[in-house]
Design a protein with these regions (language model features):
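Long, Lys/Arg- and hydrophobic-enriched amphipathic alpha-helices
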Residues: 1-163
């Protein structure tokens, strides 16, 4: 956390991915040329470790689709998750030889890739009304504000130039 200039407040809890740097070193070593995309929900370190907003960290658990706050109960029967620190992911990637090319929302990422054109192309396909509706609903869900559209996409590259 010192590398990022982050100092936790007294009593503040934070989640740290100890396997992040070794994993990104492995990924970068396996990649001669190309992109690494990290897609998940999370924040930059400055936002993530803001004690005013998250004194208790971001760790949450879900049991049968209901959020709980007891990670050491129902072991093996509930999901445990935490938000991604995208500043740490970018920093670890850079140390491993990747260039950080951008961090955007999934909504913007898919839009920039031409999601609207895909939507138009699907409209020209010979699909049933039910299939068309399912495709429309799926596309909307991927970019929905406040939902999956808020996922972050970190784009890192190796030997690809700049955007």
């Amino acid at each position: 956390m010192d590398d990022l200039g982050i100092e936790l407040a007294p009593g503040q809890t934070a989640e740290i991915n100890l396997a992040l740097e070794p994993r990104l070193i492995e990924i970068a070593a396996a990649l001669k040329r190309g992109f690494v995309l990290t897609v998940d929900y999370g924040r930059t370190a400055q936002d993530l470790y803001d004690p005013e907003a998250r004194l208790r960290g971001t760790l949450v658990t879900y049991h049968q689709h209901v959020q709980t706050d007891a990670p050491l109960t129902l072991i093996g029967r509930q999901d445990i998750t935490a938000q991604v620190d995208f500043t740490s992911v970018a920093s670890a990637g850079e140390k491993a030889g990747l260039n950080t090319l951008g961090l955007v929302t999934q909504r913007d990422f898919l839009s920039n890739l031409g999601l609207d054109r895909l939507h138009q192309q699907l409209a020209g396909q010979s699909l049933t009304p039910r299939q068309m509706q399912a495709n429309r609903a799926g596309i909307k869900e991927l970019v929905r504000p406040g939902g999956l559209g808020e996922f972050k996409v970190l784009v890192q590259g190796k030997n690809v130039g700049s955007p």
